[in-house]
Every structure is written in C-alpha cells, then in structure tokens.
C-alpha cells in the first residue's frame, strides 16, 4: 500500500490526515464541495418565518384531539433543548419529550433534561438502551478500529426515537441539529 502525499485543501484547513478526503483538480476537498453544494443552499440562518408557521400550523392541525402534537428527541444539549423551548414557549405545541439513556449519558445532560421538562411542564418518555448489548457493540467497534466510534450509540438513539414514534402514531418528530458545527463528514 503506497503512502499518500500530504495535501491541504485550497479552501479550508482539512488535509490528508482524513484518510477518506478527496480533492478536485483545484485542490478543494470534498468537505467543502459538500458544504457549497448541499448545506449552503439550504442553510438560512435568518429562517423562513412563513414556512415555519405553515409547519407549526400543520403539526397543530394533525395533533387535534390528541394529547401530543409531536415528539421531540431531547439529549440535554443546546440544540435539542432550544427546539423543546421553542416548541412549547414560542410555537404553542404540545410535545412529548423522548430521552434515551445510552449508558454513556453525561450527568449534566441528564440534569438539563430534568430542568427542561420541569420548566416547560411537559411529559417525558425515557428509553433505556440495553447496557450489555451496547457494551458488546462498542467493544466490537473499538477492536475493529473503525472510525466513527459513536455509531452504535448514535444509531440506537435515532432507531429508538423513530421506532417509538411509529409504534405510538406520532406523525411529527422534532430534533435539534446544527449544520454549522456538526457533520463535517457524514458517516
């Protein structure tokens, strides 16, 4: 196997320390191409109030006669916490909060979840991932030395959220994410 020549992107600081990075003929990396082609065209920091209001109205209409309008995945981090706050305080939605105990939760995240639930006056459903199965999966990832060691945990969180939604008839799921600080490379 030949060693790759060191190269830095002509547009950012990414380099060949990322073994999967690809450069075009001008030296721009695929991370930058992904940003300019997929993220930037859909990234609107100012928001689109009309579209947001249409979505809120649809969620409320679909939730008529039900205890909850939507399901919100809450990690206790900034993004999902802000979504929960907006859903209740700004948009007047009636969410059920969905939190996952992955066996690796930080104490601060768990405390944040409790504070948010209490302050917003919302119900919560806790899903506990099987500890032994999670440890076996993560040990297999460590031993195989694959990148993205968080894959078992991340996939379990979203699988639990979407399975719960499907089993319980939730039509709308709100999650928090941030294109500006997450997912430089999608797994």
Regions found by a protein language model. Name each.
Residues 2-187:
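ATP-dependent adenylation/nucleotidyltransferase module used to activate substrates
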